Design a protein with these regions (language model features):
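Subset of outer-membrane beta-barrel
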Residues: 1-231
């Protein structure tokens, strides 16, 4: 924030293969992380007393990679596990600073586990209940999200989400493309209300999601060659 700037660039690749009734996806990503600090930091006290703040403008970069696996059965269930910052590299630049007030940003490995299930309430594929969970940890602290959405006719949905000891939220959305003849367009809104001690200083947060998905690969048309010899 302020004098600090971050730049992350990654390339990701996933391979899908059929496994039983579903599909298993295996993926990796590799990239770089860059951190920089400007030299126009203004502090009311002496900033050189804080070894975590660079004494002058500096920047540095390092590589990073992650991996994950995801198994899903369409319109039925999914489960996934992944980890980020596997090498736990650090972004550091101690040149010409004597190691005091130098840039030293350590990345921590993060783990994610998620799972979800689609329950056809009336067995008519109209009302679908979608409970799901997401657990995140860096081996020092853990965060758990519990969600429940209900979807009608694959067009509109709504539900609640609860982040343990942190927040509770409401979610609504619609597959707006179905209403305006623009397939693949979805719109969603969410409001999170803080339940932790931060509630005294926060009235919650409001989010808007706009998503468009389309298939960029089109199945080639089958061409038939006819010859008078075989008519």
């Amino acid at each position: 924030l302020g004098i600090e700037k971050s730049l992350v660039a990654k390339l990701a690749y996933a391979y899908h293969l059929t496994l039983g009734p579903g599909t298993l996806g295996l993926g990796v990503d590799i990239g770089m992380l860059s951190k920089s600090f400007e030299n126009n930091f203004i502090a009311i006290d002496d900033p050189t007393l804080d070894p975590s703040i660079p004494n002058s403008g500096t920047s540095a970069a390092t590589f990073d990679f992650g991996a994950g696996a995801y198994y899903y059965i369409p319109n039925k269930m999914y489960v996934g596990i992944s980890t980020l910052h596997i090498p736990q590299t650090s972004v550091e630049d101690v040149a010409d600073q004597g190691g005091v007030g130098a840039l030293d940003f350590q990345q921590s490995r993060h783990y994610y586990i998620m799972a979800g299930y689609d329950w056809d309430i009336n067995n008519d594929k109209k009302w679908i209940l979608k409970p799901s969970v997401l657990a995140k940890t860096d081996a020092a602290s853990t965060q758990l999200d519990v969600n429940a959405l209900i979807e009608y006719n694959m067009k509109v949905w709504g539900g609640v989400t609860y982040r343990v000891e942190d927040a509770i939220g409401l979610i609504v959305g619609a597959n707006v493309g179905e209403f305006i003849s623009f397939p693949g367009l979805k719109l969603g809104v969410a409001y999170d209300l803080t339940t932790s001690t931060l509630a005294d200083h926060s009235s919650g947060s409001f989010e808007i999601m706009l998503r468009y998905c389309t298939n960029i690969y089109k199945q080639p048309k089958r061409e038939v060659y006819r010859s008078v010899r075989f008519l």
